[in-house]
Amino acid sequence: INIMRTIENIRRFRLSDTFIEPYKTAKVPWGPIGYITYKRTYSRRLSEFDPQATGTEEWHQTCRRVIEGMFNVQKQHVVMLGLCWNDQKAQTTAKDAYERLFNLKWTPPGRGLWMMGTKFVEEKTGAALFNCAFRSTKELATKGGYLFAWMMDALMVGIGVGFDTLGAGTLRIAEPTYTDDVHIIDDSREGWVRSVQVLLD
């Protein structure tokens, strides 16, 4: 038995299938283009969660992913800090949040609809949930490569990145001396981000 997997399962927050069942056939109060926009932009492929599944999520499934993801983040935070988690209270609050989300009385930011409750957020980074970020260039002379790599990483997960010009004039771009160094770039987001830092540093 994988102890870490068992602990992970104990800590995971879930809404019951019984609670979700009536929502499978309930009417969603979409506007004229709401459903099309949702399916195009926020509905994830079901194969991400079940390799045998085909197609994309329906609204009741997206709501479940988002609410369970949201409460998993909260529950993991509480457990990591050794605080008291009240599962009954969490279930009540989550059911209320689900009902309101399903009926479009509230929604998270679009990035929350798109990414919350996914393996990417759980296993790699929650940065994909962020709409915007900002970096100062004040330390460009000492952190140049890192700053640009950080911005590239953020941009590649869809974050809009703002910056100031406090570092203007602190670095000069010179023609590099020839080198026969070879850098193998992993064909992944992380690999390309690292390549930019290596190039600039």
What are these regions (language model features)?
Residues 2-201:
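Extended catalytic cores of very large enzyme megasubunits
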